[in-house]
Amino acid sequence: KDPRDRDFLGEYEDCIEMVMYIKQSFDVPIYYNLDANHEARWGRYMAGKAPELLGLKLFSIEDLLRLDEFGIKYIKDIHHIKIGKLPVIHGDTVFRFGSGVFPAKRLFDKVKTSCIASHVHRSSEYTDKSPITDEMSTCWTTGHLMHPNVDYAKHTDQYNQGFAVIYKDASGDYEVHNKRIYKGKVR
């Protein structure tokens, strides 16, 4: 995006508003923010532009996003977490060189087990079944929650808005609902 067109305060307020909306819309016991490439970009920016501020808690990404205030657990320096038995990754390590035509299939090819990832801003699902063990694995990638007409992605029309809702039971079994947002409606 052209830096002259940036409205950092407006973008920041939009981000906080989105976090509040998510918290109000979904009644779940705990929310997580998994540190990934976006947070790393903030760290690189601060190190290059304002290194003297790096030690101040006020300028940490978790304080800027008010994660404690919103009851969101910040997870840093961890490749993945699990919701029940389902591994959850951001995907920046798996999709380092792009996601290809079918991101969920590419995810499966990399992790070889059921998993859900974001990062590619595209909803997809791929299921595979082992002919040896009869085990079935499914991988999902989720859409994004940003504005649908971002300047940096004009080269692609494959991005879609979306998110996943994951239910788990006491045994760790899970159910994934990979939602898309199309024309303002959750589908």
Q: Each predicted region: which residue ranges?
A:
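Flexible, charged surface loops at secondary-structure boundaries
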Residues: 24-27, 68-69, 82-83, 107-111, ...
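Active-site-proximal loop/helix segment associated with metal-binding centers of metalloenzymes
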Residues: 48-87, 91, 98-102, 113, ...
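Acidic carboxylate-rich catalytic motifs and surrounding loops in phosphoryl-/glycosyl-chemistry enzymes
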Residues: 30-37, 74-79, 177-181
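Conserved beta-sheet core of the metallophosphoesterase superfamily
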Residues: 86-179
